[in-house]
Amino acid sequence: NADSDDFIKISPNRISPIVLKKEHKNVVFTSKNAVEAILTSSSAAELKFENIYCVGRKTRRFIKNKFGKVAHFENSATDLAKYLVEFMEGSEITYFHGNISLEDLPKILTENNITVNPIEAYRTKLSGKKIPEEVKGIMFFSPSNVESYLKENSADKIAYCIGETTANAAKAHFKEIKVAKIPTVESVIDLVN
């Protein structure tokens, strides 16, 4: 028996046409939400993104459908940052992100003399909702899901997490945490089953 709630609400920011009309050699998206937010301000055909880098398979698939190509993807922002330090052409990136985002990627890039131009593409609003006590486990797909869930609920359940970053957010509160082998929704569901 399963029920679904995101515990968060996403709202795209309006991004200046001046920013979106200029050419961007290296662009980074750490979530599908950021890509969707950009596409509310401009069509994919109008955007001049030379190399698109991203985190996550779902984000990669979405970008391929909208833009046609992804230069490289990794399953975590830290792994992507390490890749960019090693292999990216140029010394500057445009980083589309949400208002609640981890600093790992920009920190690693900046420490390695890569200029990061951050653009807040969307806002995440935590919208905690009370869950029935009999629920035994909760699936989390982002650290902000964990934070929002904890606003209205206790941590006496099993936390099923999409990846290590989300699991790290859960570790401070939950006793039992299970992490998907591959960071996909399907893998988290497999964990539960």
Q: Where are each of the predicted segments found?
A:
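Signature of uroporphyrinogen-III synthase
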Residues: 1-193
